[in-house]
């Protein structure tokens, strides 16, 4: 496949000896699955049509979680007038996303020990509580702001599952030639939810009019508040529907595993964490993902705040954010499908994507400094640079996830992706923390984008790829 495999020791414990005829009954734990696999010629796995329903439910949950997380950034000007939010409040509302990743390792443990169903049910229940908390009708604005912050915090706690469990779901339910596509769909829908917040918020909630007389301003404030509450109630209703559907049907795994890798023995939680932290290659590629994606996520969450000095309206900022993420989702799924057909090309795909991301982020940053660079600052240039940046960075997410799992296999997928998304949100949190103190001048925030993309490009260039899980499915099962 054009790449060197990792050490023989890393592949040694994957397949256990012996085979009983009842493979489906034996696959109730990873250890039993390993013992149930044949020592000689494993048969191909079996896939079930219900896998698409499981993927749909999980993807909808991820979509709404991203939508709820990005509720306030696109309508920050309206939220200031309706609830008296400050710039610090707006930054903190976005910051609850990465703060929710602090108990990430607990969710990773739960996913590894109790499986997909229990973890997804807990996640959706937290989202029900969070979105419900924001809808409590209270006239006291101080208490209302606290409830909104509490709701955003609970929704942030759902982030570890919707961001980490996509590769686990794809390995559990999908065959080797569908895994990257399933991972892309499940992981990209969270970003698509954040993109739709750029569209829904500004279209439903009107922007404030600072030139209105006092009485008209009070009427406008009440109208804006009513429209924001309509959005909050709608999000609460959708979350309740998804929770009910998940409670009714979301099986933890199929009766039979879809591939050899899905049935093979994995490392324990403790051994997995130790393996990840001692693997220099993994740490290298994890930083290549975490730094630019963390910076970009924080930048996207306050895009309206960043574009306000450039005299970009709330609606235009919403459309820019929407198309940048939608383009990334479409290209990401297309890239993942391409990776399913032509295997062993993940590093090359990432090099191409981050070359484009470095150029487009530099273009955007220099455009915002038009008083120095004299580059044209127009709606077209802002649209083009932001959309290209979103396409290149967002589409890299599923490719990164597949490369992580291949690099450190047999570490479980949920633990692997949990570590890297924790790192990404840590960088995002640090950036937004500084934003709460340095929010009057934001050119430093823009320069973080090309700097992080260039650093990631260099790390990917030095990375030596390997495909241990693919080796197991393609070579061992033949």
From Swiss-Prot:
Q: List the disulfide bonds.
A: none
Mind telling me which InterPro entries this protein's record contains?
Answer: FLVCR1-2_SLC49-like, MFS, MFS_trans_sf, SLC49A4-like
Tell me which parts of the chain lie in the Cytoplasmic compartment: 1-51, 111-117, 177-184, 251-281, 336-347, 406-414, 464-478
Record's Gene3D superfamilies? MFS general substrate transporter like domains (1.20.1250.20)
* GO cellular component labels: intracellular membrane-bounded organelle; lysosomal membrane; membrane
Mod. after translation = Cleaved in lysosomes by cathepsin L between Leu-214 and Ala-261, generating a N-glycosylated N-terminal and a non-glycosylated C-terminal fragment.
Q: What functional role does this protein have? A: Mediates H(+)-dependent pyridoxine transport.
Protein name, entry field = Solute carrier family 49 member 4
> Which organism does this sequence originate in?
Homo sapiens (Human)
